[in-house]
A protein has these predicted regions:
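N-terminal pre-ligand scaffold of iron-sulfur
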Residues: 1-55, 68-69, 73, 86-103
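Short cysteine/histidine-rich metal-coordination sites, predominantly Zn2+-binding motifs
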Residues: 56-64, 74-83
Length: 103
């Protein structure tokens, strides 16, 4: 397991980017205090994704598709294409000292 951060490093509704197995990834702390991580690439055409802590969604910059922060599933996709795949999740654990690790 690889340590990414500590809970104190990320406020509720915040995020941070990190590298996971050579790929850009994002760690998100939702307003409900869930900790999730995803490969930071849209499954449609590989566009960058951004976290919107106000709306609690992940947004693809290319086609404005939206993904649920809690599980990476498609929330809404562009009408120009059908998107059936959600974001690629990364297993996250938090230890008793609030350190955040990915597998």
């Amino acid at each position: 397991m690889e340590k990414i951060a500590n809970l104190d490093d990320i406020k509720k509704g915040g995020s941070l980017y990190f590298t996971y197995k050579g790929k850009k990834a994002i760690l998100i702390r939702t307003k409900k205090d869930d900790i999730v991580a995803y490969i930071a690439v849209c499954p449609h055409e590989g566009g960058n994704i951004e976290w919107d802590g106000q709306l609690n969604i992940v947004l693809c910059e290319c086609h404005l598709s939206l993904f649920n922060a809690s599980d990476g599933s498609v929330y809404r996709h562009s009408t120009a294409f059908e998107l059936n795949r959600g974001l690629t999740g990364i297993d996250v654990t938090v230890d008793k000292e609030n350190n955040i690790f990915v597998k």
